Amino acid sequence: MTATPQASARPERPFATVNPYTGETVKTFPFLESAEIPALIERADQAYREWGQRPVTERAAIMRRAAELMLERTDELASLITLEMGKLLREAKGEVALAASILNYYGEQGPSFLEPKTIPVPQGEAAVLHAPLGVLLGIEPWNYPLYQVVRFAAPNLVVGNTVLLKHSELCPQSALALEQLFHDAGVPQGAYTNLFLRIADIEQVIAHPAVQGVSLTGSERAGASVAELAGRHLKKCVLELGGSDPFIVLDAEDLDTTVKAAATGRLSNTGQACIAAKRLMVVDDLYDEFVSRLGQTFSAFVPGDPADPSTRLGPLSSEQAARDLQAQVQDAIDKGATVVAGGQRPEHPGAFVQPTVLTDVTPDMRAYHEELFGPVAVVYRVRDEDEAVALANASTYGLGGAVFSSDLDRAQRVAERLDTGMVWINHPTSSAADLPFGGVKRSGFGRELSSMGMLEFTNQKLVRAFPTKQKPAQVAG
């Protein structure tokens, strides 16, 4: 999903806008030179000294202004997203609206999240204060060029931290547009800085004494590398990594509605979402009909120009992404998986993979264990909820999941048994500003969004006050 700070067998791609629908390289951008990095970090540190001292209400007002500007620039920003990573234009506009809602949420609610929390004590007073930490590095992916950045940057800017952004090399113009938007809203120079970093220079940033933490949304491999660097340099980190989310169907009053939800949960953003419904688990008595209808639904998604409002299936983010996904699909086919729909690259220019439904996937196949980052669904037959839970929890990932049942008590019972950070009932796993987002196991740690995301990079400082004549108690610790 995002570039890994670890050495790769593939050559490092430059920051460039490459239209995944046409293959055209629209614009390239030079890497930041290593020698330039320390000055930019020091500028961010100096900005923190001033930005962090401003009243939180002032910082929050700037976030609300950023939300207004984002909505005003919807067409421009959405067009950039579609150009750079191939998202359907209507979905790109939805991403802009979601990102703006996050900016506005922290602009409105942020100050209350930072209010001191008093602790009842026998004598005197005790409170926990929420203070900023300083300069933070965000490493963000291409699949949601605005939303992913904003869910990290907005709460931390309101807290009083300053932000350095290393965005994906696939969406440099989106990165620059967001930087300009923050500055136009009133975020001072240095408080939010886009960096076109080489992978090899990420450690230099994390290691710098002024940098207090790092947040990464990306692949498992990238997360492991960043966690290693953060640990080596004793920096706080938050990781939102891959997912292979279960979508469990226990019963259905309206099977068509459930199938539609499964298709939406799998094919939104051409399937390039960490929380997409990648592993579908359906009970015996519904399985055959569910698979048949899902295959028909997937087959109706025809590739086309993502900027055309009538298009239902956009390209993947790059030709390399399409080749990688097709290799996973072909591995499953070669080893005996059944293709219900799709299974091939369409005869259409662009980075497309046919919407694919696979069954009879077994543990010797890559598709059983690996995240499929594109429009491919794997459907499993299960006897009952116990088998569904066991299969769901057999994954090394633990990001999100969905449970569908007309019996809400039953669905709730299953949800509580899933080893994931999020579970949605009778709805595909999704995201909203006021709901915490994050996973467990190899899907990462820490939370973004809601009040929980706002407090990740704060100094939760205890202040304990005694009357002046209080006799000191025995000290321990």
Swiss-Prot record:
Positions annotated to bind NADP(+): W142, N143, K166, H167, S168, E169, G218, S219, L241, E371
- UniProt keywords, alphabetically: NADP, Oxidoreductase
| Molecular function as annotated in GO | aldehyde dehydrogenase [NAD(P)+] activity; succinate-semialdehyde dehydrogenase (NAD+) activity; succinate-semialdehyde dehydrogenase (NADP+) activity
Q: Top-level EC class, please?
A: oxidoreductase
Q: Which GO terms describe its biological process?
A: gamma-aminobutyric acid catabolic process
Q: What is its EC number?
A: 1.2.1.79
Active site located where? E240 (proton acceptor), C274 (nucleophile)
What chemistry does it catalyse, as a reaction equation? Answer: succinate semialdehyde + NADP(+) + H2O = succinate + NADPH + 2 H(+)
Superkingdom of the source? Bacteria
Any Pfam family from its record, for instance, is: Aldedh
Q: In which pathway does it act?
A: Amino-acid degradation; 4-aminobutanoate degradation
**Biological role stated in the UniProt entry:** Catalyzes the NADP(+) dependent oxidation of succinate semialdehyde to succinate.
Family the UniProt entry places it in:
Belongs to the aldehyde dehydrogenase family.
Entry protein name: Succinate-semialdehyde dehydrogenase [NADP(+)]
